[in-house]
Amino acid sequence: MKRPSDRTGPRTLAHGAVLGLAGVLLMAGPPGPLRAAPATAAWEPDLEAEPHRYFQRTPRDRFSRLIPDLAEGRLPLDRSSERALVRSLLRALDIPESSQLLVFSNTSLQLSLIHPGNPRALYFSDELYLGHVPGGKIEVATLDPDLGAVFYLFDLPREGSRVSVERARRCMNCHANEDTMEVPGLSVKSVAPGPEGGSLDTFRAGLSGHAVPLSERLGGWYVTGTGGFDGHWGNRMGRLFQGELGATPLEPGRRFSLDRYPVATSDFLAHLLHEHQVGGVNRLVRAQYRWREVRHRHGGSLPLAWPADLEAELAELVGYLLFAGEVPLPAGGVAGDPAFREAFARNRREVEGRSLKDLDLRTRLMRHRCSYLVHTPFFDGLDPALRHRILGDLDRALADASEATTGATTGATPSTHATKAVGLGTRNAASRHLGGDEAATIRRILKATVPGYPGGAT
């Protein structure tokens, strides 16, 4: 398949699309080469073997603890309609319905039910993900500190029936491969969906996170709240036109009734934050698996020196948590659905009125660029030595950013503590994009809100 490329046409449309014969949009390619994937080693775990035993371990995530209540009908669920049941299930799991994302490409387990007229809905919180396609089953992905992403499948609870929750093995075909960094993780597909089903092209394969160019995202998804920005692949059906890959527009709600869903949005901001979470989760899960495997090879002890490729991955992880490489938001910024913004901020941990969940939305996602994932039970449950290492590396990177800026102002030389941070050179690669004031604010927030952070909370 020939990828979209810059080409001319009779009439130029916004963001590089051109109108060809028959009204087909011929999509221009991204403005530059796709960003390279993280520098991960050619490593993948044997999930069945020691020390991982993915399917043999008992999960200790939040959803697994709720399964008995769900199975026995003790959760307060409204069974009057499919929509009402999904809404009440979201409330019971504390997942905001305003996080709804609609995907119409048949790139998931229940693909036979998914099409532009019956999109699958995805909902998410900081640690729990729920999927539902009308007429189908409920899918749940939850984050376990030892196992990574764990997947469950069950039929919609009916009046008087017992719910049977299945731990889904089939999900691992797509959730433990290149797209998830070879570990049990989360996947965000972006494809050019074909009019007869299937995909005509796939974008950003093997990549996840806030560094993926917007022009490679959202293929096969409905998107609302873009403010007119269309430099992405959302709201489009792929077409082949004279051997070239093009697209025709798809307006959300045109081929189906949004009344069938809890809300009428598939908000652009929710898509952006979901992308950040997926990239962070996959990197943290990979670090946990690699760390555990190295310790296992050393009889449970920490080695004197870690493999160089693992050190490189940990450095990249710390940079990711500090939003290194984040692509800029569209000109004019992003507004975000008010209901989603309110729901996103409801569990913010603030210090002096500032929080890691404070949104910027002018040129970047967050005002204080350190991932709020460090406040999740999933992060707290990582191997204690790994968590200690990540927090120490974060602190050194932030100290470097703060002191380097101070040194530039006063002529002072950054301290030894700062220059020994993760990354080489006079500025830490993980934090060189941060200004000194921002880095200092982030350190204050982390010290006050993250147990075990150097010099902070215990």
Q: Regions from the language model: what does each represent?
A:
Residues 4-23, 27-33, 402-431:
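Intrinsically disordered, low-complexity terminal tails and inter-domain linkers enriched
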Residues 16, 21-38, 98-103, 115-157:
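Post-cleavage N-terminal segment of exported redox proteins
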Residues 37-110, 117-123, 127, 139, ...:
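Conserved small-residue
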Residues 97-105, 329-334, 427-438, 457:
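Surface-exposed patches in mature extracellular/periplasmic domains of secreted proteins
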Residues 111, 336-371, 375:
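Charged, low-complexity intrinsically disordered segments
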Residues 130-324, 365-407, 423-458:
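Sequence context surrounding c-type heme c attachment/ligation sites in exported
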Residues 321-329, 344-351:
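Alpha-helix capping/termination and helix-coil
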Residues 325-332, 336, 357:
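C-terminal catalytic/scaffold cores in eukaryotic proteins
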